[in-house]
Amino acid sequence: MSGWFEISQAKDGQYRFVLKAGNGEPILNSELYKTKASALNGVASVQKNSAEDARYERLTAKNDKPYFNLKAANHQIIGTSQFYASEQSRDKGIESVKNNGVSETIKDQAV
């Protein structure tokens, strides 16, 4: 099963999206957006940029855990990964976003 995007609304009324792999695990989390339309634009940006390796910023957090950001052509962060146990697992996470980020399935959980 291929991945999908989930749009949800936070308690403060803002929106976010999460890209989930086919097994349901979250692999990319967005920032908060003021409108659902803006969150959907973020999804479109993932769909457009996720296949390009140059769009991934590979980082290490202060706790020494590897993670990554997916960036748009204008260098704005589109989404951030979870923390990984190793660089190899982070790189597998990037491959998963590359494979699932083109998904056109959007599950709207915002009510």
Say what each PLM segment does.
Residues 1-2, 103:
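Charged, low-complexity amphipathic helices and coil/IDR segments
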Residues 4-8, 14-22, 27-33, 42-46, ...:
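A structural feature that tracks compact, well-ordered secondary-structure segments
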Residues 13, 107-109:
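A cross-family "folded-core" feature that marks the main globular domain of proteins
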Residues 37:
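Glycine/alanine-rich phosphate-binding loops at beta-alpha junctions
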Residues 47-55, 98-107:
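Short arginine-rich
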Residues 65, 110-111:
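Short proline/glycine- and acidic-rich turn/helix-capping motifs at secondary-structure junctions
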